[in-house]
Amino acid sequence: MEIIFYHPTFNTAWWVNALEKALPHARVREWKVGDNNPADYALVWQPPVEMLAGRRLKAVFALGAGVDAILSKLNAHPEMLDASIPLFRLEDTGMGLQMQEYAVSQVLHWFRRFDDYQALKNQALWKPLPEYTREEFSVGIMGAGVLGAKVAESLQAWGFPLRCWSRSRKSWPGVESYVGREELHAFLNQTRVLINLLPNTAQTVGIINSELLDQLPDGAYVLNLARGVHVQEADLLAALDSGKLKGAMLDVFSQEPLPQESPLWRHPRVAMTPHIAAVTRPAEAIDYISRTITQLEKGEPVTGQVDRARGY
């Protein structure tokens, strides 16, 4: 079995060695320009067109949970990968726990009014504030995939009312499920904290805009953990300035790194992190990839395959 590997920033030697240990019958090599030798599987991130074009691969693994970048490239270069070759994304591989940590810590930060207390501290004001109740602090999750399910599961333990919005109906215990555009308003109008975990598709680009934000209760919060292109940043800032939104926590941006001139840097009610909410953990990724390749070789059912038409 031949496996080719390409990632512009990962420690390639470590990955090659770890994959060969996990798959003793495989030969793993770093792909370099001019390498047209046969391969059965390709593990990639931001691959050049020539790496995949014309190859008779059994499968391709994108080395991340998000596949919007590689799908965009495949759409621009359809000769790059035959539609019959399955494309897989990393399923969880430690990202679920990281998303849980991030979401729970931020929801609790807002719920306990730590943002307000930080503002008071900056003014040297000693002023206890009224507490919020859980009943008024409904959390709504846009995007009900693997990571959305993990976040909902972690928040359940804290007793917040939970709801999700997705393409298909979910039957998660303790979570109200809303489906499609026709139920979006009902989902939004009782959501105090909006968590975005949607995939990046043509239908979701710019979805967090003034029209959507206006449907949230006054004083709502937005937590974006998905993609920066989901948010119309000017609309978000306008909602913050008007008081419609009380705060926003952003891990992703339409342009990364975020330009120095962006007003998001200086807005007092915007907090941010540099796209670190959930990163690929190599050991967990190796385990998922090696297990999935073994299942494919045996003809067994697998999970994590991308629906290229849907975009996730």
Curated annotation (Swiss-Prot):
SUPFAM superfamilies: NAD(P)-binding Rossmann-fold domains. Its EC number is 1.1.1.79, 1.1.1.81. It catalyses: glycolate + NADP(+) = glyoxylate + NADPH + H(+); (R)-glycerate + NAD(+) = 3-hydroxypyruvate + NADH + H(+); (R)-glycerate + NADP(+) = 3-hydroxypyruvate + NADPH + H(+). Keywords: Cytoplasm, NAD, NADP, Oxidoreductase. GO terms for molecular function: glyoxylate reductase (NADPH) activity; hydroxypyruvate reductase (NADH) activity; hydroxypyruvate reductase (NADPH) activity; NAD binding. The active site is at R227, H275 (proton donor). It is found in: Cytoplasm. GO terms for cellular component: cytoplasm. It comes from the Bacteria. It holds the Pfam family 2-Hacid_dh_C. Its main location: cytoplasm. InterPro entries: D-isomer_DH_NAD-bd, GhrA_Enterobacterales, NAD(P)-bd_dom_sf. The keyword NAD applies. Belongs to the D-isomer specific 2-hydroxyacid dehydrogenase family. GhrA subfamily. HAMAP family: 2_Hacid_dh_C_GhrA. NCBIfam families: PRK15469.1. Catalyzes the NADPH-dependent reduction of glyoxylate and hydroxypyruvate into glycolate and glycerate, respectively. This is Glyoxylate/hydroxypyruvate reductase A. It comes from Salmonella enteritidis PT4 (strain P125109).
